[in-house]
Amino acid sequence: MTSPSSSFWNTASREAMKSGMFVAKVYCFLHVTTNYLGFMAYAYGPSMIPTLHPSGNMLLAERISKRYQKPSRGDIVVIRSPENPNKTPIKRVVGVEGDCISFVIDPVKSDESQTIVVPKGHVFVQGDYTHNSRDSRNFGPVPYGLIQGRVLWRVWPFQDFGPLGPTPT
């Protein structure tokens, strides 16, 4: 025969276990989704004007294509910064492996240009607003391994909600 207090504790422990399992399932779902399928990225600053607003954008990026195909010219990608791994800038791919890229090193200060060949396993990324962008002109070509995902959609600001596909460069 069970006492009323032990019945209460049995019921409470069962409910706690159910709740704990639900929380664990939600956490696992979110972990798999954000680490393997897609994620939300926040972009702010002037480096991608006119494509992105300098005051801030919420973007939907996917991680699947980086596993099965190489980035293409014109793709907007989220990268892990080669200079500061805590930052994830958003830039446009302007050159893929084997491309010969000529660029002005610092368009604000001079018109000195440089030409490089993008090495195998790398991409050359650049902000759309080259006068105010820290990109491959500063830190060199980016290895594929630092690409976190490809941007698909702008989610916020809502009036500009929609796809952000590649544009010719």
From Swiss-Prot:
The organism's place on the tree of life at top rank: Eukaryota
Indicate where this protein is primarily found.
mitochondrion
For this entry, the protein name equals Mitochondrial ATP-independent inner membrane protease subunit 1b
Q: What is the lineage of its organism?
A: Eukaryota, Viridiplantae, Streptophyta, Embryophyta, Tracheophyta
The molecular function GO annotations come to:
serine-type endopeptidase activity
Please name the GO terms of the biological process aspect recorded for this protein, alphabetically. Answer: signal peptide processing
Q: Where in the cell is it found?
A: Mitochondrion inner membrane
Task: Give the EC number.
Answer: 3.4.21.-
Q: Which residues form the active site?
A: 47, 91
What the entry lists under Pfam families is as follows: Peptidase_S26
